[in-house]
Amino acid sequence: MNKTIIAERFSKAISTYPREANVQRQIANKMIRLLQKHIPSPCPKVIEFGCGTGIYSRMLLRTLRPEELLLNDLCPEMRYCCEDLLREKQVSFLSGDAETISFPDKSTLITSCSALQWFDSPEEFFKRCNTLLHSQGYFAFSTFGKKNMKEIRELTGKGLPYRSREELEAALSLHFDILYSEEELIPLSFEDPMKVLYHLKQTGVNGLSAQSSLYPKHEKQTWTRRDLQHFCERYTQEFTQGTSVSLTYHPIYIIAKKKKV
């Protein structure tokens, strides 16, 4: 993963992400309901990695009432999106790559919503989270599965190396007891393929791979008008449902507890 490119894309989408990220907001709401069901509250020490503009963060603060809430994101600029949260004395922000930066230990909960798919090695990160958690700590996250944005992958051959729910569970179970897991498909409808591309750009996902964009060649090379027309024609032909075209999200939700030694 080219983390620099990832950070640049999401930084550019800061002003439009909250408006366009309806699926991510829906997923965050569901994550909160699952946390309320499976994790004791209040939850004293919470780390959220990949906090973005703070959609999930605000829900965490309101619902879990942590004594300490550490927000982390790859993009330093996300701090400014969370200024209202950072006015609360128990909330702090740490920018950097969650796979490599230092986090405080003895946390009660490490959690994330719609971020893990950008990691180089979720499996190594699971091991790391186990060492950072309190002996009775929890690890809860949502990510995306192999059918996420399947329409884009089918047309361009590009996409992230998504893990299946079974692969995630197998890696997690080495360090955690899995309390709950679920996956679902969320289809979105758009007027035409151009609206799909606009949606992806406005949410920071204008390239589905960290190394390459949707475009067929180099990261900085844009499509020609003919390329764009061909993409839209194929998208319309293959993914029209009624009077609109579809884009599929494939969220996976997992709640786990640190294994007893």
From Swiss-Prot:
Q: Into which EC class is this enzyme placed? A: transferase
Extract the Gene3D superfamilies matched here.
Vaccinia Virus protein VP39
Q: Which InterPro entries match?
A: BioC, Methyltransf_11, SAM-dependent_MTases_sf
- Pfam families, per the entry: Methyltransf_11
What is one GO biological process annotated to this record? methylation
- Reactions performed catalytically: malonyl-[ACP] + S-adenosyl-L-methionine = malonyl-[ACP] methyl ester + S-adenosyl-L-homocysteine
Q: List the disulfide bonds.
A: none
- Keywords annotated in UniProt: Biotin biosynthesis, Methyltransferase, S-adenosyl-L-methionine, Transferase
| E.C. code | 2.1.1.197
Record keyword Methyltransferase present: yes
Q: Which residues form a coiled coil?
A: none
GO MF term list: carboxyl-O-methyltransferase activity; malonyl-CoA methyltransferase activity; methyltransferase activity; S-adenosylmethionine-dependent methyltransferase activity
What function does this protein fulfil?
Converts the free carboxyl group of a malonyl-thioester to its methyl ester by transfer of a methyl group from S-adenosyl-L-methionine (SAM). It allows to synthesize pimeloyl-ACP via the fatty acid synthetic pathway.
Q: What HAMAP family does the annotation carry? A: BioC
Family indicated by similarity: Belongs to the methyltransferase superfamily.
Q: Which NCBIfam families match?
A: BioC
Protein name per the record = Malonyl-[acyl-carrier protein] O-methyltransferase
| Native species | Bacteroides thetaiotaomicron (strain ATCC 29148 / DSM 2079 / JCM 5827 / CCUG 10774 / NCTC 10582 / VPI-5482 / E50)
